[in-house]
């Protein structure tokens, strides 16, 4: 495991990097690009858990994402301090770990449809229950069909930040490879040649067939280990994104429920 590669500041679609002397670090730039994106702003009207609440107290996906990012920044800085001391890293600081985890956390729900997992189920159903949806599937390869029959907000999120937001740029928002790798909790496509590897990182998929080459480029920059054709080991800091999300929804969602009693 090479932490210098895992914290790669390379950006897909860009051949140059910002000089270190600038006031903002690359990971802070990632955070700012996400904050000011229209895709992130759209989370303000998407349900976290409780839809159509008449109370302005209840969280939306937007406020949830901000809270997860705040927790992720703290977790990243704490883990970063330990990693730096253990591995003797030079030129890297705990706040760099905090900033990159915060950026990935900020975008972690950016691909979720309205109504969350229920929205994912509705999209999957449409492709089998409607004539129009079935007609779309007929024009796709077997592997591509699985992208829709198993529609996944995590994969849609990867597509949004790397293609749909700023579509004229290769790499979309052109976030750093480190942020993209940490964002991708499920580093595999919707189909694999054999049985998927065991483990939490492979229970879902994190990118569409059409985005496989781009993620392979990101994984190569980060030095992520291939575990099967079309699947890689998870970036170690991705576990902090998941932890921050769990901490927030297991406490805050209960708080919202209590408020709505």
Predicted regions and their residues:
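A short small-residue
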Residues: 46-56
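Low-complexity, highly charged intrinsically disordered N-terminal segments
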Residues: 59-63
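Sequence-structural signature of the catalytic-core scaffold of metal-dependent phosphohydrolases
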Residues: 1-23, 35-45, 66, 70-71, ...
């Amino acid at each position: 495991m090479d932490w210098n590669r895992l914290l790669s500041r390379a950006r897909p679609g860009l051949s140059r990097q910002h000089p270190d002397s600038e006031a903002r670090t690359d990971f802070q730039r990632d955070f700012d690009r996400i904050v000011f994106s229209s895709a992130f702003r759209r989370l303000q009207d998407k349900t976290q858990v409780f839809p159509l609440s008449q109370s302005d107290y209840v969280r939306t996906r937007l406020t949830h994402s901000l809270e997860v990012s705040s927790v992720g920044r703290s977790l990243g800085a704490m883990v970063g301090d330990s990693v730096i001391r253990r591995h003797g890293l030079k030129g890297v600081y705990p706040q760099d770990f905090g900033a990159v985890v915060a950026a990935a956390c900020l975008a972690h729900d950016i691909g979720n449809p309205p109504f969350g997992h229920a929205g994912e189920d509705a999209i999957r159903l449409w492709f089998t229950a409607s004539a129009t949806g079935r007609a779309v599937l007929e024009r796709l390869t077997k592997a591509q069909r699985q992208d829709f029959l198993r529609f996944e907000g995590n994969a849609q999120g990867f597509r949004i930040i790397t293609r749909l937001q700023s579509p004229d740029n290769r790499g979309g928002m052109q976030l750093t490879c480190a942020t993209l790798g940490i964002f991708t909790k499920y580093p595999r496509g919707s189909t694999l040649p054999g049985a998927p590897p065991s483990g939490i990182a492979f229970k879902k998929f994190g990118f569409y067939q059409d985005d496989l080459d781009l993620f392979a480029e990101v994984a190569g920059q980060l030095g992520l280990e291939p575990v099967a054709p079309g699947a890689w080991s998870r970036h170690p800091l991705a576990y902090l994104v998941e932890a921050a999300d769990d901490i927030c929804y297991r406490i805050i969602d209960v708080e919202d429920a209590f408020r709505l009693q």
